[in-house]
Amino acid sequence: MAFAQGSRSSLSFIVESTFGTTPAGNFTNLPFSTHSLNLTKDRVAGTDIQADRMPRVDRHGNRQVAGDIVADLRDADYDAFLESAMLNTWSTNVLKVGTTPKFFSIEDYAADIDQARLFTGMTVSTMGISLAPNQMVTATYGMVGKDMTIGATEKTQDAASGAAPFDAYSGTLEIGNTNGTPATAAIVTGMDFTLTNSFAPTFVIGSDSAPQLEVGRAEIEGTISAYFEDAALINRFLNETETELEVTVGDGSNTIKFAFPRAKINSADVGVDGPTSRIISMSFVALYNTADASNLVITRSA
């Protein structure tokens, strides 16, 4: 008897037109590194007091799906997931924060034992991007969804794009004043940011799965680490300077740019960890900018 191996696993997806309903048609293969998609159920326990002290009733309650998909960021393959994270659609290769959710059916297939878990009503609740020297650009999509079923039939898949992952060597990070002209900062050692939508299921009487998901604000926070070269970055924190941050990454042929047109630096810590170079550790929050009508603007190459 075979045990399912991670090396024989695949993810694929299709966009839903009706929340929680898998449409007809081919799924699209989704490159990934790891995932933790799972169905959970609440428990509903009886409260009767028994003379022998032992409970009699424990039932399954509300159902919901959650988990992370971790992947190397690349061209094309995750464009629909970027739309889901931003609640908007691409317009001439530009994507801004919007208000229209996008939902998926996602299949987790174990090829060696021919078992497929189908997750429905899935959307991107959080999106985290991590950049550092000597590594691929990592994206973590925190998914929330409606329900899951399991079966022995794999969905027909269209192939992924085959695009190479983006790396930090092909990227730049620029810093400047809001609505100004940012300049390349060649002293940055790392950057991470997370977009949080706070999707959550809304449960009603008569169903153990949510008829819809509610959504919160598009909150974006991140961190930047840079060599302590002068006072410029620290002054942005001290003076509460509204700052524009732009980071562009690529694969040698294609690029994607994440622009935060109006950010606030909320900390600038400089410690001494030993005899080597000192590092400034900064945190930032991205705010709505009137000129861009967004707090995050994503631009992909044509």
Task: Write out the residue ranges for each language-model feature.
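Signature of extracytoplasmic/envelope-associated structural regions
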Residues: 1-302
